[in-house]
A protein has these predicted regions:
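Short amphipathic alpha helix immediately N-terminal
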Residues: 22-34
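Helix-turn-helix/homeodomain-like alpha-helical modules used for DNA recognition
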Residues: 80-106
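Residues within the DNA-recognition helix of helix-turn-helix
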Residues: 55-58
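Hydrophobic positions on the alpha-helical face of helix-turn-helix-like DNA-binding modules
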Residues: 28, 41-42, 52
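C-terminal flanking helix
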Residues: 60-67
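Short, Lys/Arg-enriched N-terminal segment that forms or immediately precedes the first helix
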Residues: 4-16
Length: 106
């Protein structure tokens, strides 16, 4: 799994992680956040590598489906992009400080 995919899955997990089963959360944590191999995760959980892959694939599919329907991450990234553009357009220091505070909170 490449870095870009892990970053995207981490973002999806942050938004939709609570919709996953405990097992799916655990496998996302091990595979994506801790960068363990399917074999390592399987050994830790006493399941096969194939079971790890299957559970991860189902978790990813579930999160992608939710994002496709709800578009929460897409909207969040849109707001962040608009604030960043607004920051570039303004010369008002007070406004820039407020925008930076908002961006930090996001």
């Amino acid at each position: 799994m490449d870095i870009a995919t892990k970053v995207e899955l981490s973002k999806l997990y942050e938004v939709y992680g609570n919709s996953l089963t405990d097992k799916q959360k655990q496998i996302i944590d091990f595979c994506v956040l801790q960068d363990l191999s399917f074999g390592e995760v399987g050994d830790l959980l006493n399941i096969s590598r194939q079971a790890v892959k299957y559970t991860l694939d189902n978790a990813v599919s579930s999160m992608l489906k939710l994002e496709q329907e709800l578009k929460i991450l897409d909207k969040f990234q849109g707001v962040k992009h608009k604030l960043t553009n607004l920051l570039k357009l303004t010369n008002d220091d007070n406004l820039r400080q407020e925008i930076n505070k908002i961006l930090e909170e996001l």
